[in-house]
Amino acid sequence: MPIDIREPVITVGIADMQAGVTGRLNGNFLIEGTGLLSGPFRASADSGGVLLFDEGDHLVAHAPLVRLAAHEGSTFRISDVTIGIRFHWERKEDQVFEGNLILTARDASNIAIINEISLENYLVSVISSEMSGTAPREFLKVHSIISRSWLLAALDRKNMVRKPAQKPGTEELIRWYNREDHDIFDVCADDHCQRYQGITKIISDMAAAAVNETRGYVLAYGGNVCDARYFKACGGITENYETAWEETPIPYLVSISDSQNALSPVLSEDRAAEWVKGSPDVYCNTQDEELLAEILPGFDRETTHFFRWKVEYTRSQLEEIIRQKSGIDFGTLNDLTPLERGPSGRIKRLRITGSKQSIVIGKELEIRRWLSPTHLYSSAFTVSAVRGPDGRPERFVFNGAGWGHGVGLCQIGAAVMAKKGFKASEILSHYFTGAEIKKIY
């Protein structure tokens, strides 16, 4: 994206493919051709489009798309929004939003709920949803800049021809997940893009102050806005872009040590076995409970073992998980063999061997997805098969490091750096090699 634009208005998919929605309009909203509406509402779909009903259950609009334009100061509440979709923290909650509400019929049975809002107002919610508005000031500034950068780069990527998100092969299933595959809105409101939970999570003025202080600032490289990725905790070393996404190295998304001292990469199985059971002196290796309470939203604090973790399954449990996630019957599961790791120890290619067949899968998110009812915290793990007298595995034990894909900014590491006194510019330089901070509007 060129380094000179105006602040855009964006569309955020709050929920998609919903049979119906209920909520409340707090203040007046204008529906073109209909008039003002406020108070409780519900909506569903039929062959003619969206059916919008008011508090008295009167039909007030029936069209393929219904746009409710907010009067100044008005907000709207959506009930039972699912967050953390397919992750271990998945749940439903009511959320309140600023800006306009758009209801679009997907088909005769489902609708999409979309929020139209200015980018800067969107960011205040993202910062407060991804982390906590009580986090250190320099960290909130860092997150404002990278979230702004990611969003602008994502808008630009929508207009590009992308490589297929799957590498074909009969014995290999190598798949990754792009974040610009939404067709009727710019970004979604969940972890697939950036967490956006409206004004519900804005618990202090600090996030708004950080967004305002950094207004229009982005990370740039080579004259373009950076695709600034981020995640919760690297485990000690961040990852190269191509371990998680397409085989196109990005100069500012390269592996770095999450410390002032260089650490050797975790490329071999011997090094991985040592790494996942170690406790290196790195920024995201923190036991500062006060800081974690300041920076993590409530549901993220439920995850206590994010730096190093352990998961165990019986063989039959893991066989069923893999069968459910992949749709493939491997028979009796014999082995899981890492074939290729990135510098952080995250597995890029993993062979699954069963009595019926053997398949190589990747990349990191697909591996995490296949080996858990939700997702493993990361693909930086070792796996040991505990075998019975007949030589067949009875249990599989996973020892792992970190939380997330590992590419770009380590959120917990960056927050620790801010607590130690590092400035936003220093934190960004640490995680994004060679990138610069630029003001574009």
Language-model features, listed with the residues they occupy:
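Conserved, single-site charged/polar hotspot
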Residues: 1-441
